[in-house]
Amino acid sequence: MALRYPESDPVVRTVKHRLDSTDAAAHAAAPARTTTHPGAHPPLSAKDVRRLSMFAPALVRPAIVDSFRKLSPRAQAKNPVMFVVYIGSILTTLLWVMALRGQAEAPAGFILAVSVWLWFTVLFANVAEALAEGRSKQQAASLRGIKTTVQAKVLADPQRRDRVQPRAATALRRGDIVLIEAGDMVPGDGEVIEGVASVDESAITGESAPVIRESGGDFSSVTGGTRVLSDWIVARITANPGESFLDRMISMVEGAKRQKTPNELALTILLVSLTIILLLATVTLLPYSIFSVEVMKAAGVTSSPITITVLVALLVCLIPTTIGGLLSAIGVAGMSRMMQANVIATSGRAVEAAGDVDVLLLDKTGTITHGNRQASRFIPAPGVTVKALAEAAWLSSLADETPEGRSIVTLARQLGEAAVDEAALARSQPVFVPFSAQTRMSGINVALGDAAHQIRKGAADAIRTHVTVLAGRFPEAVLAAVEDVARKGGTPLVVSDNDRVMGVVELKDIVKAGIRERFAELRQMGIKTVMITGDNRLTAASIAAEAGVDDFIAEAAPETKLALIREQQAQGRLVAMTGDGTNDAPALAQADVAVAMNSGTQAAKEAGNMVDLDSSPTKLIQIVEIGKQMLMTRGSLTTFSIANDVAKYFAIIPAAFATTYPQLAALNVMRLATPASAVMSAVIFNALIIVFLIPLALKGVKYRPLGAAALLRRNLWIYGLGGLLLPFPGIKLIDMFLAAMGWV
């Protein structure tokens, strides 16, 4: 039976809203009310933070200050390799003080020069790490600026929106029901349980385009600190104070408790082992040198033992200080690059795992497709024009607030076929017929001109029964169109006007633009893509073919996804998955790399180890590239660091033992001016190379979609050979400069 909705009903308000041709986007353009902390310095926005250049003053100045703060023993002890340099700096400083007091083992100026450059080496490593952390700190500051003190409108009874109780947002608890109207800030994380609204999430995502949040489905999550631009929603708070998504984001990007990843730990163990071996070897050189001097003295040859200052310089130049000084910065920069991609990762482990992914599982709904069935075309019945069908479908959908109903209205307008006089329609006081499980139809009763119309849309069998009752007939051509749409994986809706069948509206899951090309890139990387959906095999096969995935699993239940992930992991594969629905949460929790969409449900975001603020599942390709880039950068700089130690051998070994074993002068292939200049040149080069490699460590080695073997060969040629050859001209140029200036 038809219902005349009361004026206060949201459906009628929405229809009037549409008939007045007022779009949500117009509300988005209106100025929004904001609440800020009194006297607070406005932080950089999320978009401004991502646009900061690597060496922007906003990052460099704090990094220099932080580099001095990191000179504490506790901070230095976190990096064993640089801690050795730190101890060496202190030791040479003490030796310089002793030299000033007449207890010199070497000229005071030489000891001071070595000490200063050792301190520079430590500071340069600190600057690299501080620069990597700087962007994260700026992001955290911008997120803190979002947190505002607002008054929430708490509903004691969700059915009575006119009775609200003001309460501070900080006092909201999980389970509270709040009303959020146009212009209001969302007081806390929640799930929309009623209504639909346009929401500005730019404060968090950096994207100015508003998004739609509605009850039901996978787009029901709202985040505290965002702003409702139009309409209203009722939301259930899902997080207690201090546990919100914004709070967790701040904690993540600050990285105060950043743990080293497995690969980083393994590399640290390798570097520490090399450092210990070289430390023991260097320590034994002093007694060996003293013994050699005594032996040569007995033979009538005058020589002097190696000094502690030179031994410290030798040790620092031989241990892998380059990668040791940049290792932490590489890890932090990987997290920072992920943040620049608008992805929040819970840990470096997740970023690193992204670089080793073998299998990618994709939930169809909202990931490969837009997530809602959308009207794609009108198929008129014999004797009916597309215009007549579009007008009937448009009228029947005016009060339909489902995504499908809205898409029908949109398609009719896009085609320019909905030419009904909207003013006359509003004056006619139409009666809207809501959808019900019993009738499986919805529509409108309206008088247009002198004729009364009962326009309905719904399932084919429901419309067939309705038309038959009105003494109409259901054309065979329409039945064939219904079967054809279903066979292709779409959903057919039949539209009727009184006793006449007007035609079919085809609803289908629309595959996202550009998704096929992105899957081709994944395939080139060696990553297998698998689409998982609860649809039947026919629908799944159609969408899989259109999207270009490698494989698909149809009629899958949530436990099917979980079982497939465990099966792939049991075969030694790393599995990545994107998802946005509550049904994705168990699989997201099991996956090695679990990227939840920010537009998705709260359960999905809590289960994942990454959150994509742009809610773009194709972002996973970029995430994989960032993960691979971090691994490649770490490996490349390790290769470079170890390789360039070879050149330092030829510079510092002959210089260190020049007075003990003059014969070692034959190894001075670079023809360095003096032993002192050789030592100083090696120490200075060792410090400066960290500075020159900071941009590479922060920006990362450029990733190319090549096989692992090809990438390894390429990087060995560039960074292995480059690390071997570069120190020779570098040390020689520094030596020539020192000699020309007369400083050695």
Swiss-Prot record:
It comes from the Bacteria. It catalyses: K(+)(out) + ATP + H2O = K(+)(in) + ADP + phosphate + H(+). The active site is at residue 363. The chain crosses the membrane at residues 80-100, 108-128, 265-285, 310-330, 650-670, 678-698, 724-744. It is a multi-pass membrane protein. InterPro entries: ATPase_P-typ_cyto_dom_N, ATPase_P-typ_P_site, ATPase_P-typ_TM_dom_sf, ATPase_P-typ_transduc_dom_A_sf, HAD-like_sf, HAD_sf, P-type_ATPase_bsu_IA, P_typ_ATPase. Its main location: membrane. GO terms for molecular function: ATP binding; ATP hydrolysis activity; magnesium ion binding; P-type potassium transmembrane transporter activity. Mg(2+) binds at residues 580, 584. It is found in: Cell inner membrane. GO terms for cellular component: plasma membrane. Keywords: ATP-binding, Cell inner membrane, Cell membrane, Ion transport, Magnesium, Membrane, Metal-binding, Nucleotide-binding, Phosphoprotein, Potassium, Potassium transport, Translocase, Transmembrane, Transmembrane helix, Transport. ATP binds at residues 400, 404, 435-442, 457. Its EC number is 7.2.2.6. It is an enzyme of class 7 (translocase). The system is composed of three essential subunits: KdpA, KdpB and KdpC. Part of the high-affinity ATP-driven potassium transport (or Kdp) system, which catalyzes the hydrolysis of ATP coupled with the electrogenic transport of potassium into the cytoplasm. This subunit is responsible for energy coupling to the transport system and for the release of the potassium ions to the cytoplasm. This is Potassium-transporting ATPase ATP-binding subunit. The lineage of its organism: Bacteria, Pseudomonadati, Pseudomonadota, Betaproteobacteria, Burkholderiales. The gene is kdpB.
